[in-house]
Amino acid sequence: EWRERNRHFEFLPRRHSKLCIAVATNPARPGDATVGSDDPQAVNTLRRVFDTVKWLPGGRGMYDKLVELALGGEAATTRTGPSYQVLAHVRVVRFREMEYTVPAEAGPACVREILRTVREKNLPVCFPLEYRYVKADDIWLSMFEGRDGCSISVHQYGDVDYRPYFAEIEPIFWK
């Protein structure tokens, strides 16, 4: 449904929860106004909570429950303006990122396998996974030229060795 109603959308799933953070991006309509604000420190808060509970038995599952409680009632934020302002986000955290674009029809299975791998192998990661769906365009150098696609990004904090995590996840994109 989100795919049909939006120019593109993204979601950030939680690894041990059925909740996610969802973002839809569409051209503005007359009367649209900015409502709410982003929190550029949110990813730092996620890490502090993770570092506090990760050593406890069941701590990673506890982490997602705490995040669910904290974010479950978040009000929607609406941003309007030129695309260079609306699509850009303040980054106050250093991180490493690996991103692949897959055909839209392969996106859901790919993200499910990534989440399953993180859970089953108990990978120590709390940085949000990003899944972004974009409709086809006609721009020759675009990853979405001629077809709908999904960009899936995995991240790790800049001061944490990203290689073990990325090495586990990257083969999933090659299928």
Model regions: which residues?
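Noncatalytic alpha-helical scaffold of FAD-dependent oxidoreductases
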Residues: 1-175
